[in-house]
Amino acid sequence: MADKYPPEYMEFIRLFNEGKFAESHRALQGVWSENRSNLFYKALIQMAGAHEHWEDESYFWAANLFRGAAQLLAAYAPRHGGLDIDQLVRTLETCADVADAQRNNRQEAYKLPPVKLTV
């Protein structure tokens, strides 16, 4: 089934699932820059960027990008690109809430729910 998707997309998923968010972002960036109307890829890039901001403790930007990605992906529900978009949107909304909570209370150590992409 994976062979029906572009290799850049599959590389994005592999790298993202390995926690290599910057690399996953770059794997999809070239394809997206050729067709910026592809809001699905834009959302995935934002999702990876949100994780990068989380790792950098830029919680405001993490929350912002998690929400933006969730909003863009909602248009592709219930499934797209082999992904369960409904579940992914719910998880990203939770991630945004967690990032907001962490930003507002840096004394606590909040954890993001895991995001695993399965095609």
Regions found by a protein language model. Give the residues of each.
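Boundary/linker segments of alpha-helical solenoid repeat arrays
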Residues: 38-41, 73-87
